[in-house]
Amino acid sequence: MIVDSISSSTASTSSSSPTRGTPIRKSLQCAVCGDVALGKHYGVNACNGCKGFFRRSIWKNRTYACRHGGKCLVAKEQRNACRSCRLTRCLDVGMNPRAVQGDTVEDPEWDEEAMPETLSISTQTDALKVKKKSHTSLFTLDIKKEQIIDNLRAIYARTDPEEFWKLTYPGTYDFRYAFHNTKVVSPRTPLTPTAERIATLNDVVADFRRAFVLFVDILKSIDQLRDVQEDDKMKIAKSRFAAFYWWLCSTWSAKAGCNGVCYSNGSYHPASISDMPKSEGKHGVRIDYSGVSQKSLENLVEPLRRMELSDEERIVGAVMVILADPVPNVSTKTEKILAEARDFYLELLGYCIKLPEEQQGIRVSTMVLLLASIMELVHLTTDNIQLSDVLHVIDLGDWSQELRDHRYRRQF
């Protein structure tokens, strides 16, 4: 794990220096909320409350949503009013999430304590254990990271022989069978997210199916998940596909620059209602009942477009989105495996960012903060698909019923 050094106070050998435990008055201010600061934590002067809040937010991979457009004031008196704006403020002033990953002392769940005006040197020294790795082990780890990135590239580039592209497999298939036999869902056609034409309803369905096959291929490539029991693996697949799908389409849309949701087959779903695809017939019905296309542009595509992600950030970020949130009702062993995989791919995402280490952490955290927008889109998309199903606008197949039933439910 890459760890930033956190400065600590050391006693001077000079006779004029204060002895350990001697009270001294500090005039430092917390860069986040303006309260009294203990010293530097994660790269900036921070009070105990903001230090603990930032630490837990990163450790527990928390995502927050602001109900006021991200414009809340973060000050000592109301710093707990909006956690989303508080975390954004932490990142803006330069707090480094990568330093948190190496911190071995976890704060208690509460983060607000009375702050005395005078503090002793002994209370300001944080214990930090850093695992030292030899140059050889670091080199070996870098090789492994490059291999994983190359493997992900190969998955995105993988295609079936062209003679299989038109084959269909009519029949009734449950989710588990489709997961292990993806040919009944879709062939691996080339991914062409170029947004050259407005999508038809057939394009929408074909993209959903092709994205699911890509999702399964990626999920099966994650080494840490190979020992997960079968039932838990199905829960992971059902609960995380929707978030993965939105990340996939949104990163494609940001790169293609289209005014809508970019698909894998050269088409895109326009944000303009008048241009949206409809079902056949005189009174054709559209599938976007919630304005989800426009919301995806505003809340997800535009921030991604400004970030100008590299190909490595896009493909590793997709895995990070799959692993980002806890999966409900899996075994304790699976929870631990998911947490370990999450930490590994968070580090791998930082490895893909060719910036100074402090800026790496800020960029990674900015991507993680987008998860709140992704989950809002998952809500809206679920409503769209369920209503479309009732109106018989689209038919995704029997295999997808379990996926649609569970794509946002917290219980299985």
From Swiss-Prot:
Low complexity bias locations: 1-19
Zinc finger (NR C4-type) stretch: 30-50, 66-90
Region (Disordered): 1-23
DNA-binding residues (ranges): 27-102
A Gene Ontology molecular function term of the record: RNA polymerase II cis-regulatory region sequence-specific DNA binding
NR LBD domain sequence ranges: 144-407
GO CC terms in record: nucleus
Annotated keywords: DNA-binding, Metal-binding, Nucleus, Receptor, Transcription, Transcription regulation, Zinc, Zinc-finger
Cell location: Nucleus
GO biological process entries: regulation of DNA-templated transcription
UniProt key word Amino-acid biosynthesis: no
Primary role: Orphan nuclear receptor.
Family note: Belongs to the nuclear hormone receptor family.
Protein name: Nuclear hormone receptor family member nhr-61
